[in-house]
Amino acid sequence: MKQILILDFGSQYTQLIARRLREEQIYCEILPFNTKYEDIIALDPAGVILSGGPSSVYGAGAPKPDPKIFSIDKPVLGICYGMQLLAVNGGGKVTACKKREYGFAEVKIKASTSKLLKGMPKKFTAWMSHGDGVHAMPKNFKVTATTSTSPFSAAEDDKNKRYAVQFHPEVVHTAHGSKILKNFARVICGYKEKWTPASIMTASIAAMKKQIGKGHVICGLSGGVDSSVVAALLAKAIGKNLYCIYVDTGLLRTGDRERTEGLAKKLKVNLKIVDAEKLFLTKLAGVTDPEKKRKIIGALFIEVFEKEAKKFKDAQFLAQGTLYPDVIESMSVKGPSDVIKSHHNVGGLPEKMNLKLVEPLRFLFKDEVRALGRELGLGSEIVDIHPFPGPGLAVRILGAVNKPDLDTLRAADFIVREELYKSGWDKKSWQAFAVLLPIKTVGVMGDERTYEKAACVRCVNSVDGMTADWTKLPYDVLQKISGRIISEVRGINKVVYDITSKPPSTIEWE
């Protein structure tokens, strides 16, 4: 399938460019800014987008693409920093702005014949985020839009198929921004194909059949949306040659195991369940540091999974639910970010086990995985399931983990999820759960004094988990959740609601 290529110069918004294009059923991929010209040509893109970035084009070490990119015989769109690169390369001028533009700006269209701004209102609000600005465009460019402080907000060179905007059409703050990106792909690049869940499914199954052939695949099935979609794709591609492994760590929620067993039965795939609760709780005994808990669980999970996987001696492949943001981050121009928390997966397994990787979701975002799941016929109980951390309930019990506290938290967490489902707020929230706090509070039940633990309810709205806002649940829903937990769950006598956003907080407490 044809694609639009996006060269990443370090913008925090680069992934949004891809998301906006894909929402318009336009397939695109993100590559590092320094990708070789020959590699780009080999992909035969319909067009190229130069992303924004935090650098100054004149700064020491500023990211620059392969020089031959500027003469590529394909349409090119420069966004913010990308526009400045096009300007400087063509003999234009970029200087520091007297007044930096950060935030909203009113854009006025100056050219009614603009292909890039076709169908846009004459005035619209756009999101600016730049300290440098273009103060002279190359001679072949004509100015198509301005703001009160930016005389070159958009410009075009139709003859050489070069287009540029100083604002960010990819962010939701820019009115009709998706239309600008759609115009670039559909009108300027002539992109005609439609990238849909059905086409994704067909292409993925065909690719896996070609890669795997008559081979056998091991898949770690957790019951979450990613691993479930991977298993469903593989079931269609190779059928009985798929071996699924479910490790019951004892740190899972009520219903997780049963849901996974039901999925395996529906898909008619082999499922091996490993009961490892005793092993995990023994290793976690007395451990209170959250990072140590994560590392113990991650290492032990790999150990258990590897031991079980080796029993399938005819397996040559390991399937993983790697998503596109992970791929992008691994090749990012920005380099390694600070590690806030260790991530739990089986990434170390293929090398140890001499297995080849199968990653059918590696070019998909989370919302696309959910759409693919629906196309595959997976139910809402799987496709719309809230994210659940790899270490499970261990990072929702603050302090040491033990079976009585796990049972208490499981009961409270089930009530939270059940009440949200009854009220319809499960669909309006991105993630919701209970946390067992390491404090005891005084209470009164009947005529007796109690001294028991407190629980916290956490419910957030988000798109991808990178940022999140706390969900404004109705008081009656909160009241039902609190009342049921106090009445039905032994060991809890107080319920609080977390109203912190991310940032500054994280979604999980540990």
From Swiss-Prot:
Alphabetical UniProt keywords: ATP-binding, Glutamine amidotransferase, GMP biosynthesis, Ligase, Nucleotide-binding, Purine biosynthesis
Lineage, broadest ranks: Bacteria, Pseudomonadati, Elusimicrobiota, Elusimicrobia, Elusimicrobiales
Protein name (record): GMP synthase [glutamine-hydrolyzing]
Broad class of enzyme this protein falls into: ligase
A Pfam family the protein falls into: GATase
Keyword Acetylation found: no
EC code: 6.3.5.2
PANTHER family assigned: GMP SYNTHASE [GLUTAMINE-HYDROLYZING], GMP SYNTHASE-RELATED
Superkingdom of origin: Bacteria
Binding residues for ATP: 222-228
Purpose: Catalyzes the synthesis of GMP from XMP.
A cellular component term, taken from the record's GO annotations: cytosol
Record's subunit section: Homodimer.
Keyword Ligase on entry: yes
InterPro entries cross-referenced by the UniProt entry: Class_I_gatase-like, GATASE, GMP_synth_C, GMP_synth_GATase, GMP_synthase, GMPS_ATP_PPase_dom, NAD/GMP_synthase, Rossmann-like_a/b/a_fold
Disulphide bridges: none
Glutamine amidotransferase type-1 domain location: 3-194
GO molecular function terms attached to this record: ATP binding; GMP synthase activity
Domain spans labelled GMPS ATP-PPase: 195-385
Active-site residues from the entry: 80, 168, 170
Catalytic reaction list: XMP + L-glutamine + ATP + H2O = GMP + L-glutamate + AMP + diphosphate + 2 H(+)
Pathway(s) the chain acts in: Purine metabolism; GMP biosynthesis; GMP from XMP (L-Gln route): step 1/1
Gene name for this UniProt entry: guaA
